[in-house]
Amino acid sequence: MAEILVEVGSITSATRLAKRLKRAGDQKARVISTPSELGKSGCSYSVKASEESVNFIKNNHQGISIKAIYIEKIKGEEREYYDISR
């Protein structure tokens, strides 16, 4: 199963989103530093979660500014990220 990365503007926003996802049943939700190949604005934080959480995130992110949502695919030794924000 693929995972998603939700890029947010601060560690506080990332922590709040991860807690919301865990309360909603996604026990995989956790805060990570945004991978360097995705971080467009220097140091940022993301929430890594299960792919099933994408609709919950898009509909329940009140008060949390989301920069982008990516799906992570692992091909061999490499990780590829696809923007699914829209």
Please name every model-derived segment.
Residues 10-13, 48-55:
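Helix N-cap motif at beta-to-alpha junctions
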Residues 28-49:
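Amphipathic, hydrophobic secondary-structure cores in small proteins
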Residues 16, 41, 57:
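Short acidic, gly/pro-rich beta-turn/loop elements at beta-sheet edges
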Residues 4, 29-30, 68:
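Structural motif
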Residues 11-28:
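Short amphipathic alpha-helix segments
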Residues 25, 32-33, 70-72:
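Short loop/turn and capping residues at structural boundaries
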